[in-house]
Amino acid sequence: MKLYSLSVLYKGDPKAVLLKAAYDVSSFSFFQRSSVQEFMTFTSQLIVERSGKGSRASVKEQEYLCHVYVRSDSLAGVVIADSEYPSRVAFTLLEKVLDEFSKQVDRIDWPVGSPATIQYTGLDDHLSKYQNPREADPMSKVQAELDETKIILHNTMESLLERGEKLDDLVSKSEVLGTQSKAFYKTARKQNSCC
Amino acid sequence: MIPRKRYGSKNTDQGVYLGLSKTQVLSPATAISSSSDSTPLPTPVALVPSPPDTMSCRDRTQEFQSACKSLQSRQNGIQTSKPALHAARQCSEFTLMARRIGKDLSNTFAKLEKLTILAKRKSLFDDKAVEIEELTYIIKQDINSLNKQIAQLQDFVRAKGSQSGRHLQTHSNTIVVSLQSKLASMSNDFKSVLEVRTENLKQQRNRREQFSRAPVSALPLAPNNLGGGPIILGAESRASRDVAIDMMDPRTSQQLQLIDEQDSYIQSRADTMQNIESTIVELGSIFQQLAHMVKEQEETIQRIDENVLGAQLDVEAAHSEILKYFQSVTSNRWLMVKIFLILIVFFIIFVVFLA
């Protein structure tokens, strides 16, 4: 499960403009990194150009999956992840990032912006945060916590069963104790009454 | 906001725009004129006419203004003209803002009306999902910006409120309040339209499921009938299948795919939510089991308690018995000692006196 890039684009009429992007290319060898980055930028632009407004789509490219979300106001986001990464989390991330972006960056700057001029720095944080979808996505987080709770509860059940066995032992032992004490009392009384 | 606005009004021009805009644009104007009844003198310029294309009655504002001016000059002479001019300029600025907001409001109302018409359409094949989505988005943005503008207007009124007269202030407050109430009613309408839309979507899905499941259930039936039963029945079932397939024209299936693509994300969200829900239900049942088991163990614990208590009683009773016995034994020993003493004494006497 890995995210490779997260980019925000503006879907212009003929071409898509890259507004801001964040990359995580640490898994590639040092010499490939720049070309990989370039390739990812190109792919993102191409995908945004080919997908319609207000649509979500997932495109498979070799073993990578590109999740794209174009809002109806032409702002688009692309996430490139490996095929294991859950698409729902990717779309949640896109929605969140685009919302944030549209709040922080003025609408007028969208068609003319470039990575150098746009002042929005949240992408890298989001990218590193969403590397682990279990932590970042609230729904998966809740799910994971619930699973944990379930395991804990199962453990509790087991210990409760053990406790039940021990209690049964205690019951039998206390019964033996009761009969023995009764016998003790009887012999003591016999001792007393005989002479 | 500005480009959106243009686009929206252009879009709605041919539709319901005229019918609604008349009433909507009029309403701020009527609010202005009604509230200005109490303040005719200091706010002559507040009665700037609404755009002529939307006015249905005759525009007599100019006459009224001139009458006002003549009245004013007759009453106060020249000395009051300067502050009045200043106030008038402020006032006109305020009126301009108010009018702009009113216009925007009416535009948004028109869009909302269009959305309502689109959303209330029940047909399965003529569903303009994209348009509706876009309109919804636009209206949402419009409402937001209107909210912002009204807040600005309020700030403006507050800033200028201290300088201008009481009447002017109440007048502007009335305008702001009326604009706000318009906006509130519009957002209510918007909400109800959205509700209608979701309801429609639900119904459509139900119908689609009915039609798309039908052929699947008819398929296994057909071969059976062809094999043994009368041929007419088989043909009949096939005919019904044909009918069912006809419903799934390429157009429909294409639409289905499109909608499915759009829905996949929502579907996956719903699935996850369902997962979470089922896990929570499971957890609940586990907790119940736990409670049940703990309750069961309470009985065994009570039994242990009783046993231990009984043993304690028995042991205490035995202890007291043994104590008693011990006491009796010790008292017996003294007796024996006494007897022995007496015997020894007698023995000594016997030995001394008889030997």
Swiss-Prot record, chain B:
Residues 287-318 form a coiled coil. It is a single-pass type IV membrane protein. Residues 263-325 form the t-SNARE coiled-coil homology domain. GO terms for molecular function: SNAP receptor activity. Keywords: Coiled coil, Golgi apparatus, Membrane, Transmembrane, Transmembrane helix, Transport. GO terms for biological process: early endosome to Golgi transport; Golgi disassembly; intracellular protein transport; positive regulation of protein catabolic process; regulation of Golgi organization; vesicle-mediated transport. A motif (IxM motif) lies at residues 245-247. The chain crosses the membrane at residues 334-354. Residues 355 are vesicular. It comes from the Eukaryota. Gene3D superfamilies: 1.20.58.70. It is found in: Endoplasmic reticulum-Golgi intermediate compartment membrane; Golgi apparatus membrane. Its main location: endoplasmic reticulum. Residues 1-333 are cytoplasmic. One of its GO terms (cellular component) is cytosol. The keyword Transit peptide does not apply. Mediates endoplasmic reticulum to Golgi transport. Together with p115/USO1 and GM130/GOLGA2, involved in vesicle tethering and fusion at the cis-Golgi membrane to maintain the stacked and inter-connected structure of the Golgi apparatus. Belongs to the syntaxin family. Part of a ternary complex containing STX5A, NSFL1C and VCP. Part of a unique SNARE complex composed of the Golgi SNAREs GOSR1, GOSR2, YKT6 and VTI1A. Component of a SNARE complex consisting of STX5, YKT6, GOSR1 and BET1L. Interacts with BET1L. Interacts with BET1. Interacts with COG4. Interacts with GM130/GOLGA2. Interacts (via IxM motif) with SEC24C and SEC24D; mediates STX5 packaging into COPII-coated vesicles. Interacts with VLDLR; this interaction mediates VLDLR translocation from the endoplasmic reticulum to the plasma membrane. PANTHER family: SYNTAXIN, SYNTAXIN-5. This is Syntaxin-5. It comes from Mus musculus. The lineage of its organism: Eukaryota, Metazoa, Chordata, Craniata, Vertebrata.
